[in-house]
């Protein structure tokens, strides 16, 4: 294992380019490109002023630490084919770091040991999809985490921790047969995509909702819960549309917000649900109604 420090300002981070890598902080460039065993560090000696790093395909690292230059920001630019493979922990600073991301970019978290953290200090990673897939890996949030792409747990253990950090993503996905565990503690989980949650295949999944609140904001939210137990779930869209719940799930509190203008809101159920408290809101007039329906005619 070695440390690789970014130097020289603007450049490309991929599996082969060596121009901007140094074996020492603020040292000469030309060191070997980081591998899965090497720690990657961006710091105040990476450049004196603002600069941009373009992420290519298979930018590899063990731990990744990103801080800004002495003046201005480092902008991490990830196009649609950009891939970062992180085999350890991720830490990016609250200031001095900006992520510019195109849909299609991916961060793979590939650790196979426990004790890894993901800390972005409330700075959004944008449209960077996140996939946790290291067999035996464990990742804990070290701050609130926001992306506008999918957050996927394929293998390993993910927790928002007892600090109850918020998670914001387009979709929350974990539909596979791999051994995996998800714990939400008392966090607020907000998903904005039409498929809010997809736990369709729950083989080898351990899901602990804790006392969390899951919020779906899309006008056509689908929760494919895989017959799991959730705590508080709110479908927050206030426009016409259909909320779909798939699987025989269990809820502590299930809430459907009222629509705010003329139209209809349908709550479509594919199976029996077990709900301790159900709150169905509708508008103040006959043209703003909420209907609960089955996806099977006659039931």
Where are the predicted features?
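Extracellular beta-sheet-rich ligand-binding/adhesion modules
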Residues: 1-299
């Amino acid at each position: 294992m070695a440390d690789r420090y970014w130097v020289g300002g603007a450049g490309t981070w991929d599996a082969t380019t060596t121009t901007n890598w140094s074996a020492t902080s603020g040292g000469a460039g030309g060191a070997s490109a980081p591998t899965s065993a090497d720690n990657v560090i961006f710091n105040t000696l990476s450049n004196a002023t603002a600069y941009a790093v373009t992420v290519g395909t298979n930018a590899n690292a063990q731990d990744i630490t990103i801080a800004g230059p002495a003046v201005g920001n480092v902008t991490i630019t990830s196009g649609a084919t950009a891939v970062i493979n992180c085999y350890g922990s991720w830490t990016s600073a609250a200031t001095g770091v900006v992520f510019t991301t195109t849909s299609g970019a991916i961060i793979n978290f590939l650790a196979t040991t426990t004790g890894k953290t993901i800390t972005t200090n409330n700075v959004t990673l944008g449209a960077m999809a996140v996939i946790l897939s290291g067999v035996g890996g464990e990742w804990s949030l070290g701050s609130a985490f926001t992306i506008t792409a999918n957050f996927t747990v394929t293998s390993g253990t993910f927790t928002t921790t007892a600090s109850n950090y918020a998670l914001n993503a387009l979709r929350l996905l974990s539909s596979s047969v791999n051994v995996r565990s998800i714990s939400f503690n008392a966090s607020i989980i907000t998903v904005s995509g039409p498929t809010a949650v997809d736990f369709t295949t729950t083989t080898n999944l351990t899901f602990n909702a804790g006392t969390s609140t899951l919020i779906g904001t899309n006008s056509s939210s689908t929760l494919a819960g895989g017959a799991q137990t959730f705590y508080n779930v709110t479908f927050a869209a206030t426009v016409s549309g259909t909320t779909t719940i798939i699987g025989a799930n269990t809820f502590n509190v299930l809430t459907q917000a009222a629509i705010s203008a003329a139209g209809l809101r349908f709550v479509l159920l594919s199976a029996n649900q077990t709900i301790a408290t159900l709150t169905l809101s509708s508008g103040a007039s006959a043209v703003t109604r909420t209907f609960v329906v089955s996806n099977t005619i006659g039931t």
